[in-house]
Amino acid sequence: MRLKPIAVDDFCAVRSLANVTFSPAGASACFTMSQAKKEKNCYESRLYLLKDGAVRPLTGGGKEASFCYLDENTVLFAADREGGKEPSLSSRFYKIALDGGEAELAYTFPIPVSQVFPLPGGDLLVTGSTFPGFENLYTGDKKLAKAYLADKKENEDYEVVTQLPWWWNGGTYTRGAYESLFYYDAKKKALTRLTGVGLAVSDVQLTEDRKTVYYSLLDVSVPRPAYFGGADLYRMDLTSRREEAVAKSRTDFEIATYALGRSFLLLLAADGKYGMNTDCDFYKLDYETLAVSPYAVYGESIGSSVGSDIRHGGGRAMKMDGDVLYFISTRFDSAGLYKLENGAVAPVMVRDGSIDCFDRRSSKMLLCALWDMRAQELYDGTGRRVTHLNDAALRGKYVARPEVLNFTALDHEVHGFVLKPMGFTPGKKYPVIFDIHGGPKTVYGPVFYHEMQYWAGRGYFVIFCNPTGSDGRGAFMDIRGKYGTVDFDDLMAFCDAALAAYPEMDRDNFFETGGSYGGFMTNWIIGHTDRFRACASQRSISNWTSFYGVSDIGPDFSEDQCGASLWPDAEKFWQHSPMKYADKVKTPTLFIHSLEDYRCPVDQGYQMYSALAAHGVESRLVLFRGENHELSRSGKPKHRLRRLNEITGWFDAHRR
């Protein structure tokens, strides 16, 4: 069969799976399935049910994502099916029986609610929004709600900033809102506040008997909440409503998360040895005495940091079964499933690719994974594929298989990959695109990446690697104070190795692109070498000094990654800023930036573009309204198409 190339809009054919969850007894599993809709320029998400080996849709509204099982036969999910035109704060949850019937309204809350946790007798634990100055909106007082909406309308043209960070990527100005924990009395249809005003709740977990709740608390009433310093762990007896501190974060013991075991609690905490990117070790906490003791030294990444542009949504990365912890961890270039038992870590399911989320119940396992260069599917605990939801998306298409290309640079190995162009003929010359990942604490792995496959289908070699600073290799990720040095050397040496290994690569038609950290490196590269025919810098960093003051992670991330404080070490910031070297640039460069990117704000793109334009360098800046740092992964479908067409068109236009 003659294969067709991957099309620029083929990401719209891919279905993204997330939030895999077993029913209480494990007889069924529910998950979300999302898909980009090009004509509607949006994403639609629905709940699907896997039972007895068959998959069927459970909801049809197109906006369902958050859900939980109420019991073995009933799923509760968030949706807004009332379609009210008037502004409202309320949120609604519906329940649907798995054996048929229409969804029916189950709960209406007077505030935005993000999570619900069923309790015995029909009551709920709820995490919902608290708004400063209107802390009692949860009571359902209609006059108070009206006053809040009127105040919001009155002040919609103004932003008053009193905290750091003052905005979040993917959102807007913080405005001081935070999550609180509430108890919902189903008979009275009333919420009761459980956690204090000015204290943000996260990572809520119920004990198996549902009598005690654990949660992380962070004081957000202060001008600079410690978002990057770990939170404190608390618990509350739901009968007495007595709250007590369980464990506190310190500079050398930053609590990232935790898991509730049968006889002890597991803490995941980092000692800060490698700054804010330090990986966690495991600690054991006694339920009675609250004594904390070391359980297992790990120092590897938790969760999947394997990059791809065909995911939409998340899911569980760790779960306790008795006193055994099952967790996803990124090692080298892949994310596998491991277990921690009796203080020792052992592999459970490790294959090339990425396990993105999982669930385990009654010895059953379901994994959502990117394996075998396929889009996401569900697999059982033996690795057997149990769904075929994405077969049609790639059927009859050329999918380049990544060929491993490793080499030794100084005292370490650099791991990389090569995708051959469609129709590759030995001895024929082909243009090359070098793609650099973000992070920098992420990895490229052997998984399906739409943009790379699109370029391979258009006749390009695509090469990519994991330089110093990448995840999956412990301390290898520590690049503090070294940006633009050893990483730059690794990247350039990888290009040399690729050209030597594949004589079909056309060194005169060599292109480069990257986003976020990859955008930083693009900006750095064009100021330090002219080897690339043209480059495309995406959502980049160009100036650490200005980044400090405008990014949602600016003060913390910039000082951590530069390995210095802006005061008195401003020269160190400038030394590692691509803007310092912008007068050396000769390479034609395209800049892609989103106007609502608050992680690497648009001023970073403005600065590099202005510098190049002022020095007469061919350059182009393309800005996207209504998009943020996630443009390439979850931006509006038409915007994603425009972005990829801009980059590809830039390279095509500069080919000799």
What is the role of each PLM region?
Residues 18-21, 159-162, 167-168, 172-180, ...:
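Non-catalytic accessory segments flanking enzyme active sites
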Residues 39-44, 84-90, 135, 172-177, ...:
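Short, solvent-exposed loop/turn segments at conserved positions within beta-propeller repeat blades
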Residues 389-508, 515, 549:
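Cap/lid segment of the alpha/beta-hydrolase catalytic domain
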